[in-house]
């Protein structure tokens, strides 16, 4: 991540803060849980000399797993929303290699039974501005600062290797909600960015129901996709999420 990108993100978020301290505040919590289903997960470490292999197809497969996400935030003066998101993910892989795999400086020989872990935990701070809010449509746009704490491990054939990766990524953030009845709405929610270093997308499409004022439930499909291609690490993955969420107004 280039330093000027981080500085620009911090500056943009900082410029949004003045004037909000004395505005009306409505806080909320959002909890989501469901099932994470692996799509693809292609790995080559180091990115220029390692063996390209998949954690989800061929001799190695990755099992689906439960997941959860938590958001805590507040809306100021009706149009300004800030929130923190915790979104951990841990997937387990296993299989028998059909050829040698060079991973993170070690060689895992063909015929070895291997186990692996793919961990992708993210912590996010998001600001969104409600630029349109009518009876039928609500639209918000903003920025997210995402802290990535990720790791890939491989064990077997007398070898164990782990590659960890921590970084800060700025993302564009937006949501669109179409209220097609007084209580029902369709929600499209996303954090995403693509650059020459890689890409990241977290997109959800959900059906939302307003149970009562300050309490709403949703059922939806989420996709998390992205990765990077560098001399040190090549990794691109896609994970599907089927989940239900509950939005609660706190005060």
Would you name each region that the model predicts?
Residues 22-89, 245, 249-251:
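Short glycine/proline- and aromatic-enriched beta-strand/turn motifs that initiate or cap beta-hairpins
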Residues 26-28, 65-69, 120-124, 167-171, ...:
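Transmembrane beta-barrel architecture of outer-membrane proteins
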Residues 31-33, 70-74, 125-129, 143-145, ...:
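Residues on the lipid-exposed face of transmembrane beta-strands in outer-membrane beta-barrel proteins
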Residues 39-65, 88-120, 148-167, 195, ...:
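Extracellular/periplasm-exposed beta-strand and loop segments of Gram-negative cell-envelope proteins
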Residues 79-82, 135-137, 182-186, 214-217:
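Repeated loop/turn-to-beta-strand initiation elements of outer-membrane beta-barrel proteins
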Residues 135, 166-168, 191-202:
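Solvent-exposed loop/turn segments connecting transmembrane beta-strands
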Residues 183-198, 223-224:
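Transmembrane beta-strand segments that form the barrel wall of outer-membrane beta-barrel proteins
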Residues 199-251:
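Predominantly the C-terminal beta-signal and adjacent terminal strand-loop region
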């Amino acid at each position: 991540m280039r330093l000027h990108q981080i500085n620009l993100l911090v500056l943009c978020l900082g410029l949004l803060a003045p004037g909000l301290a004395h505005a009306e505040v409505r806080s909320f919590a959002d909890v989501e849980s469901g099932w994470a289903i692996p799509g693809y997960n292609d790995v080559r470490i180091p990115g220029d000399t390692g063996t390209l292999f998949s954690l989800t197809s061929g001799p190695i497969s990755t099992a689906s797993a439960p997941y959860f996400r938590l958001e805590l935030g507040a809306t100021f003066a009706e149009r300004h929303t800030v929130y923190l998101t915790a979104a951990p993910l841990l997937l387990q892989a296993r299989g028998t290699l059909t050829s040698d795999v060079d991973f993170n400086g070690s060689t895992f020989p063909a015929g070895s039974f291997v186990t692996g872990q793919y961990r992708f935990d993210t912590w996010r701070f998001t600001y969104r501005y409600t630029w349109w809010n009518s009876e039928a449509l609500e639209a918000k746009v903003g920025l997210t600062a995402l802290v990535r704490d990720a790791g890939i491990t491989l064990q077997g054939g007398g070898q164990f290797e782990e590659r960890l990766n921590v970084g800060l990524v700025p993302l564009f953030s937006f949501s669109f909600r179409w209220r097609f009845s007084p209580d029902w709405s369709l929600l499209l929610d996303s954090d995403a960015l693509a650059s020459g270093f890689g890409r990241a997308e977290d997109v959800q499409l959900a059906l939302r129901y307003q149970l009562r004022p300050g309490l709403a439930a949703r059922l939806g499909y989420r996709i998390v996709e992205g990765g990077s291609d560098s001399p040190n690490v090549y990794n691109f993955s896609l994970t599907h999420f089927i989940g239900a969420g509950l939005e609660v107004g706190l005060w």
